[in-house]
């Protein structure tokens, strides 16, 4: 049975391993694989995404088939998993088992758009507001509000002019639940003025989203609320 209620939508065919935490108002689609992942509120993850040891901010759009790549050591005698006892336990001798390399956490900021089929090297930071074009292979950190694409991914342009980016960084709008307000989302200057005015009028309060531990049990996907 999939987890499908008001705060979360997580299909039954989602692979869930390790510590998976989601804020409310997260939407996942079929055949995603999650291992030690945090996903912030209002983030949408399309089908077939593989997310490994990754923190994802709020209001993100993760395209279908996005993969956070694993880290494979190249300085050892072999790159084969035969040396790790937990993978080939019946073959690896106790005396020769190697430590599996520590996988660095990948950080994806807030309001990030990642296109279909993007591959991201583990341990990178994708800045707030960044856009990654479909099919890109990301091998370096991505600066906030940059638009990147290609193999390997390179900066194509900045998403907004510097003055707009400065205003976006100042208000950090993702800390609010903006769905509660009638905003003109399609005009960046107008919507920023609206949010700035709401701040001046002290009508905005920080959105403290309910967090859930998400896990599988008895062929069901379950979400256990985490106390504040």
For the regions a language model picked out, list residue spans one by one.
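Flexible, glycine/small-residue-enriched loop-and-beta-strand segment within the central core
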Residues: 4-124
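Short-chain dehydrogenase/reductase
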Residues: 113, 131, 147-148
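C-terminal segments of enzyme domains that contribute to small-molecule binding surfaces
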Residues: 9-12, 17, 81-121, 152-228
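Conserved catalytic-core motifs of eukaryotic protein kinase domains, centered on the activation segment
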Residues: 72-74, 142, 158-159
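A generic "structured core" feature
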Residues: 131-133, 137
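Catalytic-loop Lys-Pro-X-Asn motif of eukaryotic-like protein kinases
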Residues: 116, 134, 143-144
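Conserved catalytic segment of ABC-fold P-loop ATPases
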Residues: 127-130, 143-145
């Amino acid at each position: 049975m999939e987890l499908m209620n008001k705060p979360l939508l997580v299909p039954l065919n989602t692979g869930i391993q390790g510590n998976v935490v989601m804020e409310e108002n997260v939407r996942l689609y079929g055949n995603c694989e999650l291992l030690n992942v945090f996903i912030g509120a209002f983030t949408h993850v399309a089908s077939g995404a593989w997310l490994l040891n990754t923190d994802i901010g709020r209001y993100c759009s993760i395209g279908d088939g996005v993969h956070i790549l694993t880290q494979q050591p190249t300085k050892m005698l072999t790159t084969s998993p035969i040396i790790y006892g937990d993978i080939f336990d019946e073959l690896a001798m106790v005396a020769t088992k190697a430590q599996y390399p520590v996988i660095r956490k990948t950080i994806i900021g807030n309001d990030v758009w990642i296109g279909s089929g993007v591959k991201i090297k583990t341990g990178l930071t994708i800045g707030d507001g960044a856009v990654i074009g479909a099919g890109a292979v990301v091998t370096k950190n991505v600066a906030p509000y940059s638009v990147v694409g290609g193999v390997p991914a390179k900066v194509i342009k900045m998403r907004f002019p510097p003055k707009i980016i400065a205003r976006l960084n100042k208000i950090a709008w993702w800390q609010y639940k903006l769905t509660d307000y009638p905003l003109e989302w399609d005009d960046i200057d107008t919507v920023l003025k609206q949010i700035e005015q709401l701040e001046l009028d002290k009508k905005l309060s920080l959105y403290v989203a309910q967090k859930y531990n998400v896990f599988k049990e008895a062929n069901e996907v379950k979400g256990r609320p985490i106390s504040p």
